[in-house]
Amino acid sequence: GTSGVWPDLQASIDSLKKILSDGKGKESDPTVASSLMGWMFARCDEEVTIGNEWICKDPYVQRDHAEDPLDAFTKPTTNQAFLYFCQMIDYITGPEWAAKVPTHIKIYNIAGDQDPVGQYGRGVYEVTNWLIDTGHDVKTTLYSGYRHEIHNYPDLKTEVVWNLAEFYNNVLGCGFESMMEKYSS
């Protein structure tokens, strides 16, 4: 994950544990999502009508995301699932987590610098630094002006794919060089 330190995470975990201890784990409380993720709309300059505008500025991508039958918009997220999400974020935060990641794995952190999940770039660099400080080989790319779904912006997705292909080629030696030369000219 490239979230860095999630805002008010421990308070969310404590609140969700209380909700679950009250027997409401299978329910979906909309105030939970709002308190956990409501801040993610702070930099959305368009009107928030769907509830996922933070993912991408493109309205088509927003609608496609919201209408996906496997997405939380078509089936509310339970309080228990939110607790598990928060616990997962907590587990993958900090130098202690980074030290557990095998150092032989090459890592490519990519995000938009307007992605709230990556704390608008700060969290992505936090994760990168935790990994570097624990002996990892990390490449990081932030795409200026883009939100969460960098691979879905029509004007950016080709660049994202090429950069991923180049990273994999450098790490795995997959022979992408000739393909990249053919299609990049």
Predicted regions and their residues:
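Catalytic active-site module of serine/aspartate enzymes centered on a nucleophile-bearing elbow/loop
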Residues: 132-185
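Short beta-strand/loop motif that positions the catalytic acidic residue
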Residues: 103, 108-111, 115
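Alpha/beta-hydrolase-fold catalytic nucleophile elbow
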Residues: 1-3, 110, 144
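A general structural detector for well-ordered alpha-helical segments in enzyme core domains, enriched
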Residues: 123-130, 160
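Alpha/beta-hydrolase-fold enzymes
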Residues: 1-76
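Active-site nucleophile elbow and catalytic-triad environment of alpha/beta-hydrolase enzymes
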Residues: 71, 76-99
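Short, conserved loop/helix-junction motifs that constitute active-site signature segments
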Residues: 98-103, 133-134
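Conserved alpha/beta-hydrolase "acid-adjacent" motif
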Residues: 114-126
